[in-house]
Amino acid sequence: MARAMDNAILETILQRVRPLIGQGKVADYIPALASVEGSKLGIAICTVDGQHYQAGDAHERFSIQSISKVLSLVVAMRHYPEEEIWQRVGKDPSGSPFNSLVQLEMEQGIPRNPFINAGALVVCDMLQGRLSAPRQRMLEVVRALCGVSDITYDVTVARSEFEHSARNAAIAWLMKSFGNFHHDVPTVLQNYFHYCALKMSCMELARTFVFLANQGEAFHLDEPVVTPMQARQINALMATSGMYQNAGEFAWRVGLPAKSGVGGGIVAIVPHEMAIAVWSPELDPAGNSLAGIAALEQLTQTLGRSVY
């Protein structure tokens, strides 16, 4: 590294970005998320050799929301041949809001990528066809990746999302009309919302995703999570499509593959070195953590890290 990592660096970064708190907005279209305290701020790092660093609210669990889309893709990659996945979902950035219907209609029910809602729903539809208990299987995968046995779903958040699921249901039914959705829509929606309602901390997320920094291998697991090629492909998708319609702006400012969620979390990858997780619930207009992006920008500048 250009500079040795320690917790003091992370503490300093949080101090620098804390003035941004109050300038964003906590997600309120999901009532169960609207009550989260907007002043929360945490960051954690897990290196490929198992070193951990943290600052702020790094051990407080929150709803990971769309960060889970990476995990569902990982599970799909372990159960489906590559060609079966990518004939149903694309690999290109959408440039549209994550819950857009317009582009999906124009492109005959094939989502642009697996990290927008439509693409993630297709992936969940695929998992429904291969896994006997998709929700339990996801918990098993996440617990193994994280090394923590009590990771679970926030059922209140999952229920709240299902009760306000009209738009996601419309997306699923639209894809079904084009023949790109094969299973019962409410069942798949329930799985999808449970995945989004996983509760994890920054430290747990950094440990979970460190395999993407190490060619698909995690320091604490005996078997690879994915192949080196699959890890590279996932990182590429995160770089182009992981930050909704602001992927270009994020690449400009931060320069790392990343995936965000409207719970305020962001996971970013420094290939061959580390996974970083940040959390600040207040969002920018695109649905990304306002202070979280600023913290990652400060960190990459401090360490001199970018994939570009």
UniProtKB/Swiss-Prot annotation:
For this UniProt record, the keywords arranged alphabetically read as follows:
Hydrolase
Q: Which residues of this UniProt protein bind substrate?
A: S66, N117, E161, N168, Y192, Y244, V262
Give GO terms for biological process: glutamate biosynthetic process; glutamine catabolic process
Which Gene Ontology molecular function entries are recorded, alphabetically? glutaminase activity
Q: What is its EC number?
A: 3.5.1.2
Catalytic reactions of this protein: L-glutamine + H2O = L-glutamate + NH4(+)
Q: Give the domain of life.
A: Bacteria
Pfam families attached to this UniProt entry: Glutaminase
Q: Which InterPro entries does the record cross-reference, listed alphabetically?
A: Beta-lactam/transpept-like, Glutaminase
What interactions and quaternary structure are annotated? Homotetramer.
Family note: Belongs to the glutaminase family.
PANTHER family recorded: GLUTAMINASE
The name this protein carries in UniProt is Glutaminase
Provenance organism:
Salmonella agona (strain SL483)
